[in-house]
């Protein structure tokens, strides 16, 4: 599949209302894990945007996060109203929240982007949703169904509905130090079809998705078949040319299930991985971002790599970012992005 250009990005997280401020705070080790006292659940720590009043629904919180992330994106790259723009958005898997979120975001997207080609496409794939959206957008750009693609994801696990569900499932982090810290966020990329622009923030080289039959919501041991296949597909893609990722970011929640899955897939795809092997997980600074994980971590990674990591060398390869994520229902995805330094982007 042909590469797609990344023209701009925007994000909103509890660490900052822009991609740049979120990335800087995360890298500095700042966290916003606050104790909340909700009558519906036991006292729990969560990572939430304090500017949104507590008690708002999942749809309301997701809409406000999306609104702020899109403002950040438009500042980074003003849209040309003459370009044909289509949208693919990743959202939560759960039915009650997903319906309300779709309704809220559809209205906002059409108001914010009057030239949107058709209705937005929503993918209810949890932590795997962003990668499914990315793959669908890349196919549409290649087929010239649109000139520009708005691709992103948004979610909030800090609303009453998701919090109650996590409490019922005993997923909340407790005294035994196993569980999740609920988080929330939104992030979006603006992609262009190959050859449309001469300058970009980065290049989406390839994206792969798969479905894991032994997912978290069933009882058989997870053997990481889907994540292994996704990594193998990225390795085999001609655009990667056998390169290793320089930076690996994951949507992991801090639960052992996901750590074991990644370790298994890593051992089967060592040539693709950073050397020495290191990774940064969403849980370290933002908790469980749900469906927003892939998009937010991609935006942070683009910020972190949008500067020279070493003295410039003629014809040296650009930094390679890999992001991956898996949902509770087995939707798995990963992508490889070649990042442009600030100097190169301004030429």
Report the location of each language-model feature.
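Conserved "HGTGT" condensation-loop signature of ketosynthase/thiolase-family condensing enzymes
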Residues: 1-127, 131-135, 139-145, 154, ...
């Amino acid at each position: 599949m042909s590469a797609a250009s990344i023209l701009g990005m925007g994000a909103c997280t509890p660490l900052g209302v822009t991609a740049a401020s979120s990335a800087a705070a995360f890298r500095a080790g700042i966290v916003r894990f606050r104790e909340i006292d909700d009558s519906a659940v036991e006292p729990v720590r969560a990572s939430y945007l304090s500017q949104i009043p507590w008690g708002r629904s999942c749809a309301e919180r997701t809409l406000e996060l999306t609104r702020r992330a899109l403002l950040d994106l438009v500042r980074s790259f003003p849209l040309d109203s003459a370009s044909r723009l289509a949208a693919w958005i990743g959202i939560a898997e759960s039915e009650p929240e997903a319906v309300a979120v779709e309704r809220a975001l559809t209205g906002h997207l059409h108001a914010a982007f009057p030239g949107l080609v058709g209705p937005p496409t929503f993918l209810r794939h949890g932590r795997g949703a962003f990668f499914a959206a990315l793959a669908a957008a890349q196919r549409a750009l290649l087929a010239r169904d649109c000139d520009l693609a708005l691709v992103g994801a948004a979610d909030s696990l800090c609303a009453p509905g998701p919090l109650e569900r996590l409490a019922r499932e005993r997923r909340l982090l407790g005294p035994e130090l196993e569980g999740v810290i609920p988080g929330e966020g939104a992030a979006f990329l603006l992609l262009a079809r190959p050859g449309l622009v001469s300058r970009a923030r980065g290049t989406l080289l390839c994206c792969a998705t798969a479905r894991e039959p032994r997912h978290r919501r069933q009882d058989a041991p997870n053997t990481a078949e889907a994540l292994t296949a996704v990594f193998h597909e990225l390795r085999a893609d001609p655009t990667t040319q056998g390169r290793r990722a320089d930076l690996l970011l994951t949507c992991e929640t801090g639960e052992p299930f996901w750590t074991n899955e990644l370790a298994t897939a890593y051992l089967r795809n060592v040539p693709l991985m950073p050397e020495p092997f290191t990774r940064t997980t969403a849980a370290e600074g933002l908790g469980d971002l749900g469906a927003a994980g892939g998009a937010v971590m991609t935006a942070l990674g683009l910020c972190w790599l949008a500067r020279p990591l070493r003295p410039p060398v003629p014809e040296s390869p650009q930094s390679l970012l890999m992001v991956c994520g898996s949902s509770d229902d087995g939707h798995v995805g990963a992508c490889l992005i070649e990042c442009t330094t600030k100097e190169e982007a301004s030429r």
